[in-house]
């Protein structure tokens, strides 16, 4: 307890530089205007917004599709297939913890590229895999690959509009609604052609992330 009190006192008397807030607030309309391509940063905010949608859509989509894939391809029981969700989150957590280490030894762009390649391999595996090993490996790959996409895209968007970071942050969080759009499209696709249709919808998101690679700055 004494250590906690001392730490609190030290923090209280430690000077902290605070960024002066911009004069006046921004309306919702002004924030949304940042999605319109403009001189300087071009369409980076819009591209980042779509990238966040794809990231969240793949995240939510994998959670809902992976167990169904195992049931459809391997005729598993629902209880056994539920392990797919746990496997995804295990590798997503591992990816989050190890991502900071890898970003110290490689560029942002290289790490982003490797992450997206993992996700593409995962989509191929989930689309054509017929064995437990292939499907489990694919689920693990998409979990690890998708674990650091959000912070990398988020940081690029913030760096593109340094004087409007609050507005950009809000827009990127709005991109989370991709978690509702993708499952809806995946549902339509799976009803039409089975779970491979849902995987193909997620693959479209992965392909979009490939197009975003050139927008990632190489510096850490």
Functional labels for PLM-detected ranges:
Residues 147-162:
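Intracellular juxtamembrane helix-capping segments at the cytosolic ends
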Residues 38-86, 93-96:
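Extracytoplasmic gate region of multi-pass secondary transporters
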Residues 1-24, 210-217:
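C-terminal membrane-cytosol helix-exit motif in multi-pass small-molecule transporters
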Residues 16-48:
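Juxtamembrane intracellular "pre-TM" segments in multi-pass secondary transporters
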Residues 160-195:
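A late C-terminal transmembrane helix in Major Facilitator Superfamily
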Residues 1, 185-206:
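A membrane-interface helix-boundary motif in multi-pass transporters
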Residues 110-125:
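Structural signature of the two symmetry-related core transmembrane helices
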Residues 95-108, 190-191:
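Helix-to-loop junctions at the C-terminal end of transmembrane segments
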